[in-house]
Amino acid sequence: MSKLFWAMLSFITRLPVPRRWSQGLDFEHYSRGIITFPLIGLLLGAISGLVFMVLQAWCGVPLAALFSVLVLALMTGGFHLDGLADTCDGVFSARSRDRMLEIMRDSRLGTHGGLALIFVVLAKILVLSELALRGEPILALLAAACAVSRGTAALLMYRHRYAREEGLGNVFIGKIDGRQTCVTLGLAAIFAAVLLPGMHGVAAMVVTMVAIFILGQLLKRTLGGQTGDTLGAAIELGELVFLLALL
């Protein structure tokens, strides 16, 4: 289990992980690592929250929020943000399904992708600032938001098909079963409940689950399935929806 965690941490983040800690794990077995996603999100959110706490006293709430969002993006190598941008470029191109998928593979940033990045990053900064000004525990909020967003991404993997013939997303999409999905969502719910007592965290997770489920169905209808890019988009939007639900 520990080897699986380190393999997933290395796979979906840019945090340094010694290669020997995940050696011997077959790439085809990575789908089992979905249950570690909430824990990895918890770690990323906690680091981002610590950055906010350290900087808040020095440079104020808005800049602390800016740098915490920046650190979160750096820890993932902009992986999920890139997926969000590619998804928006493809989906909002209003082309055929095959052409949308081609556009999503284009490394160039389009207008829709650029607007999506600006909106999501700016919205995160503003929502974090507002929550901090209300006296909310930002460390706990970010840890819960990142755990829940990565946990609910399982909703785009379970009983979905991969929209392409090959790609990194194919490791998870359509490869996880109902038990893995329930365990992943259950862990995310536990983290949300413990970090944000009084049912606030669980309620925000329910809102996030509904939003991500609807997103998955819309993408399925538009693209014929999911891709690694749509998973990244779901994680980014899941973080934002969770934080918005706490306002």
Curated annotation (Swiss-Prot):
Report the Pfam families cross-referenced here: CobS
Q: Which residues form a coiled coil?
A: none
State the reactions this protein catalyses. Answer: alpha-ribazole + adenosylcob(III)inamide-GDP = adenosylcob(III)alamin + GMP + H(+); alpha-ribazole 5'-phosphate + adenosylcob(III)inamide-GDP = adenosylcob(III)alamin 5'-phosphate + GMP + H(+)
Which InterPro entries does the annotation name?
A: CobS
Listed name of the protein: Adenosylcobinamide-GDP ribazoletransferase
Report the main location listed first in the record: membrane
Q: Give the gene name.
A: cobS
What is its cofactor? Answer: Mg(2+)
Where found? Cell inner membrane
